[in-house]
Amino acid sequence: MKVAFSKEFEKAVRKLSGKILQSLINVLDEVKAANCVEELTDCKKIETLENVYRLRIGDKRAFFVLHIEIEGDLVKFEYLFNRGEAYDKKNMERLRRRDI
């Protein structure tokens, strides 16, 4: 699958280091190699949203919007949150706005 990143996601990634950064790199490689979302490890669809999924990466949660395209799917990573703040109202509203 093709991969794209929002500015917010890139900013959060720049703050990472060590083991969690390496885990994120491994997950991104897995996403690029996958043919469909079902092949991804620790990936779940957000039930209240149509095209938003989350990937668990240690104590972080990476949220992405899946855009179905004729030639390959585009996975756009929108946000990277700590587990504790991932599902609060403010962040869920931000995801709802990105759900196209």
Annotate each language-model stretch with its function.
Residues 24, 29, 74-77:
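Short amphipathic alpha-helical segments
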Residues 3, 21-22, 40, 74, ...:
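Non-catalytic, surface-exposed connector residues within folded enzymatic/regulatory domains
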Residues 16, 31-34, 98:
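Solvent-exposed amphipathic alpha-helical surface segments
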Residues 1-27:
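Arg/Lys-rich, positively charged N-terminal/basic patches that mediate binding to nucleic acids
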Residues 30-54:
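A short, surface-exposed loop/turn module that caps and links secondary-structure elements
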Residues 57-61, 65-100:
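Enriched for short, Lys/Arg-rich terminal
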